[in-house]
Amino acid sequence: MIQFCTMKFYDRKYELDKLKEIYDLSAEFSHMVVITGRRRIGKTELIVKFAQKKDDIVYFFVSKKKPIVLLQEYRDILSLKIPFLKNTAFITFEDFFNFLFSYMKENRLIIIFDEFQNFESVEPSVFSVLQNYWDSKKNDIKGAFIFIGSVFSSMQRIFAGENEPLAGRTTAKLYIEPLKPSALVEMLEDYNVKTPSNLLFYYSLFGGVPKYYFLLDRYKLFPKSKAEVIKKLFCERNAPLQNEGREIFIEEFGKNYGVYFSILQSIASGNTQMVRIADYCGININSIGKYLEELTSLYKIIERKLPVTEYKVEAKIGRYRIIDNAVSFWFRYIYKNQSLIEIGEEKILLDKIYADLNTFMGFKFEELIKSILIEKNSDVGNNPLPFQFTKIGGFWTKKENIEIDIVAYNEEEKKIIFGECKLNGNGFNSIDVKKFKEKASFVEWERNIRAEYFALFSLVDVKEEIKRKLEKEKIKVYSLRNLL
């Protein structure tokens, strides 16, 4: 039985259902499963939940130790289920896998390797050994091999790289995404801190990454002030997240980490276009594309966004954003101000953060609203919008400098909704209404036949009087509280 000290387990129904399906099938057929996702996303906790009340699951962690030490540890773990192994020694991984595949001919086992990519430095021959046994014996055994990894580029190379021993052999892959907004709302309810302001604050700092909420729980920070949360987790000397970016990425990036860190700091600081990123970093515009492509496709740390109605993938109007909110926060505020922490000037750093926090949270509010709308879109009875959309995103133009926070549309029904996001929608006046509708006219999509809708999304509740005025202008008002 795998046991870890955990807080309440949230969400992950899809992933658990998928693992249960594989578990049931493994009674007759063997499976090879790969689970990836960024560090802290909850991959191990998912396996812990999946393993509950199952006595045929064996969990191995791939520590960076000498192979013989790992083999001794693995023998000891296996002997808890197979007692006669106590007096057996595995000298090589060939011995180890030979035993597993022989035993699994008659006995189902679910073998889990966590941080599987570490074998690249511990014992690279494992991949070829495993390939040989899998190719020759997979039809003779019952059970599954589940490989978990946090270094996405390494896991991608091991299981999809050209000429790699294990390439093309998986029967299932799971990429673990952040928790959905509804799970965060449930969490805040459990800790009696459910307010729109708190949801936006925690989402802005941590997104849907479970480990950060675990830290809030362990440090009893849920009921504390925003300043106390930031100070305790980021700004104090030896704070648990003071070196978060380094801990997550230096192994992934290797010796070129300085270039990647500069690019991530640039994007986090608001430079989202290729030219501005290159200027900020002092990198030639002809060279920056390589690094941006690697951060996008190989490492999956950033993404390139286009206006939602743009179909040309190579359009020069693309913008880059850091996918993970905690990473974005760290590179925006902590990375470039590490010296303030080291000399004990945490108050200066906190003041800097607080002076800019509303701007940062304003960007994240747009992302939160989009996430909520996406989650509710398939729930016909609970969809707040007047139709179910097939595409959602933002819209902007370069020439006219037009920007609309949210545009969603249904390609078959020819319906489109334009949304503005405000931390305080009470200041949205008649001039704003006029500008809003003028901006919508720049969206060319199905201009002559589309049905148009308009929405204002506000963090705070909008006064009834203002709401009535806006709805007379055909602008539906949604407060975050009403969307939860």
Model-flagged regions — what are they?
Residues 318-484:
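A cross-kingdom feature that marks ATP-driven nucleic-acid transaction machinery
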